């Protein structure tokens, strides 16, 4: 059995295992898969729908199931999330600079999963807001979309009621330098349908009045929605306190969204 077929067999065996199966075994399998994917990254991208999507789906099952299950983000969730992120971030590094729309969508979806788990690990109270959210959007400063300019980021808005994904772009002054680090991620939670739909269909520009939930004061309290939105920014070293998103703009990525229908 060649390496490609072996990976596919492993992926499918993981995909049919319970989401909360023996984590040690899942972690070991994910580690092995990650190492093999690293060696065959070119082959991965040659057949995204047949290989990369299946291999990542098996690893990401825990993450998606975890953040879509209502309830408190516990110490156990944090510990498991940290281990999951090690495997997820390794896979995500292979997805930089996608060449096709399919590759870009898979990369952005994967990025969004990692951002949510990272956020809940940093601030568990955000999980309670997420449980109440009608929808959410996640953005990243790295190159996970096609033909992005220096100050642009890529992201996806997800309707939690229907599961529909709308791919989007973001412009912000802090994106070029990753706000002092290699990258940063932004998570926006929407309290209701009206606010979410307006963001997706009309785009949005952040004003100076818009605050980031994770400030010095609110980080110690139970987070609340502000004007129907809750906004968090996360860097490679954790939650960015008092981050200023004033002037940031968001709009639909028609190329990725329309070709996904």
UniProtKB/Swiss-Prot annotation:
Gene (name only): befA
Keywords: Secreted, Signal
Entry GO terms, CC: extracellular region; host cellular component
Physiological role: Stimulates the proliferation of insulin-producing beta cells during development in gnotobiotic zebrafish and mice. BefA is a microbiome-derived protein that traffics from the host intestinal lumen to the pancreas to act directly on pancreatic islets. In pancreas, interacts directly with host beta cells and elicits their proliferation via a mechanism of increasing membrane permeabilization. Can also permeabilize bacterial cell membranes, but does not show killing of target bacteria.
Main location as per UniProt: secreted
Protein name stated in the entry: Beta cell expansion factor A
Superkingdom in the source lineage: Bacteria
Uses, biotech or industry: The antidiabetes effect of BefA was evaluated using type 1 diabetes mellitus (T1DM) and type 2 diabetes mellitus (T2DM) mice models. BefA protein significantly reduces blood glucose levels, maintains the body weight, improves the glucose tolerance and exerts a protective effect on islet beta cell morphology in a T1DM mice model. It also downregulates the expression of TLR-4, p-NFkappaB/NFkappaB and Bax/Bcl-2, and the secretion levels of the pro-inflammatory cytokines IL-1beta, IL-6 and TNF-alpha.
């Amino acid at each position: 059995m060649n390496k490609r077929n072996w990976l596919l067999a492993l992926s499918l065996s993981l995909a049919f295992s319970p989401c909360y199966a023996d984590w040690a075994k899942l972690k070991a399998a994910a580690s092995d898969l990650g190492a093999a994917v690293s060696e065959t990254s070119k082959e991965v991208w040659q057949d995204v729908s047949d290989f990369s999507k299946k291999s990542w789906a098996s690893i990401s099952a825990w993450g998606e199931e975890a953040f879509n299950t209502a309830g408190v983000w516990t110490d156990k969730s944090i510990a498991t999330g940290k281990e999951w992120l090690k495997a997820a971030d390794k896979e995500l590094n292979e997805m930089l600079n996608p060449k096709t729309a399919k590759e870009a969508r898979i990369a952005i979806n994967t990025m969004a999963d990692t951002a949510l788990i990272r956020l809940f690990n940093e601030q568990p109270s955000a999980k309670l807001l997420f449980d109440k959210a009608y929808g959410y959007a996640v953005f990243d400063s790295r190159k996970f979309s096609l033909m992005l300019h220096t100050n642009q980021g890529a992201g996806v808005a997800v309707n939690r009621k229907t599961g529909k994904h709308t791919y989007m772009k973001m412009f912000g002054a802090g994106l070029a330098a990753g706000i002092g680090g290699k990258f940063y991620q932004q998570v926006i939670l929407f309290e209701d349908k009206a606010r979410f739909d307006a963001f997706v269909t009309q785009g949005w520009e952040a004003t100076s009045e818009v605050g980031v939930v994770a400030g010095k004061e609110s980080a110690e309290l139970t987070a609340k929605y502000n004007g129907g939105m809750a906004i968090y920014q996360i860097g490679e070293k954790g939650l960015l306190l008092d981050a200023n998103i004033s002037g940031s703009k968001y709009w639909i990525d028609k190329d990725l969204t329309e070709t996904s229908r």
